[in-house]
């Protein structure tokens, strides 16, 4: 089970939002590259970046910070990024800069042909981000709820060739209420590609619960507010996940 620290970028700073609200941003660092270094030194094996300004603008907006992070840790671990990815040119630019994966969210829902083209042009590098509330997919920085069922879209996008799915329960994100394990497992069981859980991770108990269902196809979990607020000790949590993984493998 991969524990993947999130670095959310707003105006070049590392922040956390409450339920995707740009007006409710807490700044945790003015040096995102130093934050990336911290998580890698604590044992992170992948990083999750979000260009928050980009998500709302529809184009890259935190390039300098992203390049600084890649310069710091990009040679050591895979880095994935979402937010504002709406063109093949943007994907190519990001992959050339050293990103391992790009996450397509809103654009995948609104323009499935773009996602299909991206999977074809950059096979193995495309992750789809599905943000849902009560099983329905949301777009545009969570501001619009669609009528699409998350499982229907996930299966369609799997057919296109996406590498994995980041599934966020937006009712819980940034609220420290616990991961929606049931919904995440349901999605993972419905597809044959890995699912990365996101939204609401609050403590070590969530990690233990996720490890129990890892074999359903849950590859990892994105760690946001809990590791910044101190509710979750990242290094201890990754160690615990590895221990549980070993125990389950031995069973």
Curated annotation (Swiss-Prot):
It is found in: Cytoplasm. InterPro entries: Aldolase_TIM, His_biosynth, HisA_bact_arch, Isoase_HisA-like, Isoase_HisA-like_bact, RibuloseP-bd_barrel. GO terms for cellular component: cytoplasm. GO terms for molecular function: 1-(5-phosphoribosyl)-5-[(5-phosphoribosylamino)methylideneamino]imidazole-4-carboxamide isomerase activity. Pfam families: His_biosynth (PF00977). It catalyses: 1-(5-phospho-beta-D-ribosyl)-5-[(5-phospho-beta-D-ribosylamino)methylideneamino]imidazole-4-carboxamide = 5-[(5-phospho-1-deoxy-D-ribulos-1-ylimino)methylamino]-1-(5-phospho-beta-D-ribosyl)imidazole-4-carboxamide. Pathway: Amino-acid biosynthesis; L-histidine biosynthesis; L-histidine from 5-phospho-alpha-D-ribose 1-diphosphate: step 4/9. Its main location: cytoplasm. Its EC number is 5.3.1.16. The keyword Amino-acid biosynthesis applies. PANTHER family: 1-(5-PHOSPHORIBOSYL)-5-[(5-PHOSPHORIBOSYLAMINO)METHYLIDENEAMINO] IMIDAZOLE-4-CARBOXAMIDE ISOMERASE. HAMAP family: HisA (MF_01014). This is 1-(5-phosphoribosyl)-5-[(5-phosphoribosylamino)methylideneamino] imidazole-4-carboxamide isomerase. It comes from Burkholderia thailandensis (strain ATCC 700388 / DSM 13276 / CCUG 48851 / CIP 106301 / E264).
């Amino acid at each position: 089970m991969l524990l993947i620290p999130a670095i959310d970028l707003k105006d070049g700073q590392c922040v956390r939002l409450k339920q995707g609200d740009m007006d409710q941003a807490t700044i945790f660092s003015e040096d995102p590259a130093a934050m990336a270094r911290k998580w890698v030194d604590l044992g992170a094996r992948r990083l999750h970046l979000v260009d928050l300004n980009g998500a709302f603008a529809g184009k890259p907006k935190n390039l300098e910070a992203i390049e600084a992070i890649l310069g710091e840790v990009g040679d050591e671990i895979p880095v994935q990024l979402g937010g504002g990815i709406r063109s093949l040119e943007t994907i190519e630019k990001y992959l050339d800069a050293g990103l391992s994966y790009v996450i397509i969210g809103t654009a995948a829902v609104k323009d499935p042909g773009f996602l299909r083209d991206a999977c074809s042009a950059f096979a193995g590098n495309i992750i789809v981000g599905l943000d849902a509330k009560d099983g329905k997919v949301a777009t545009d920085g969570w501001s619009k709820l669609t009528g699409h069922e998350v499982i229907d879209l996930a299966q369609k996008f799997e057919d296109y060739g996406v590498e994995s799915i980041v599934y966020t329960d937006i009712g819980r994100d940034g609220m420290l209420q616990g991961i929606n394990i049931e919904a995440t497992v349901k999605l993972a069981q419905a597809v044959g590609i890995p699912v990365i859980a996101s939204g609401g991770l609050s403590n070590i108990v969530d990690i233990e619960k996720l490890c129990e269902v890892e074999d359903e196809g849950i590859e990892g979990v994105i760690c946001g507010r809990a590791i910044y607020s101190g509710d979750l000790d990242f290094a201890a949590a990754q160690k615990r996940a590895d221990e549980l993984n070993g125990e389950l493998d031995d069973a």
